[in-house]
Structures are given as structure tokens and as C-alpha cells.
């Protein structure tokens, strides 16, 4: 069984209670399912849960090269030279990130994004833009670290896809879950 959750900002990826954050238990009332990978507390979007340990490892382990798709709201203006850094191996200190596939998102696409609670801090004098980033690794805070290395602080990060599973195709509202009809 696969469960797809649209994880809100501020939710920790564990079922046990946490003193500072809501947990998965507040959203998914199904016993014996566990997250297949993690999503940082300050990130939002698609989280897959399963009761199958082998499938859980296949989704979470970078050696299986399952593509994860993120939409990142970045501070600054798009610059071809800086964005090209994301499409090459990028030394992040403790590891070298493999090249990402990227594309700028248009207003039609970003109109599908829900309001965040709490909202991000917007500075009128500093522009921002949305970028789709696809990676196959998923190391700790990798997308945020990659965009920062390219000179773009990440204001908001939403995972919209894992393999063939897409959050928008499933039509899951923020904080809601449903059984996933497609394997990643």
C-alpha cells in the first residue's frame, strides 16, 4: 500500500509526537505505514508512506535514482550563468551533487500553489521566481544547499513529484492524503 500525503509546512516526518511540531500522526490515521524518505519540516508537498519495507528502501535510497521533482521559490532574478551551476556537478562540501534538470515555472503553473501558513517573508525590493528542480539523490537539504550555492536563497520548497507520482495529478489538498494508485 502507498499513501500520498500533501505535507504542510511545519510538520515533522515522524509519527511519534514532537514538542515543537505537528507529526504525521496528526494527518494520516493509518497504522503501520512509514515515510518512504523524508521531507524537511520547513518543506512542503508530496510525501509517500508505505507498509512495504522493500518499496520504502527503493524510494528513499539514492542508488535507485528515482527522480524527485521540486518547485522552489528563490530569491533574486533568474540568471542563465548562475542557473547553469545547478545543471553541473556541484560541490556542496560533504558531497558533490549530481547535475539537476531545471526549468523556470510560469504564472499558470504557480497559480496551483496554495498559500503557506505562515506566509514567507516577502521583500518588495527583492524579486523572486519559481524554478522546477529534478534530482535523483535527495540528500539532506540538498535542493536548498544547491540553490544557495548558485546564489539563490530558497524561500519556499515544495516537492511535487516522486518518480511517476505527481502531487497535482493526484489532486490532494494541503494536509490531505489518499491511497496512491500508481507506484513511483
Residue ranges and their predicted role:
Residues 1-184:
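RNA pseudouridine synthases
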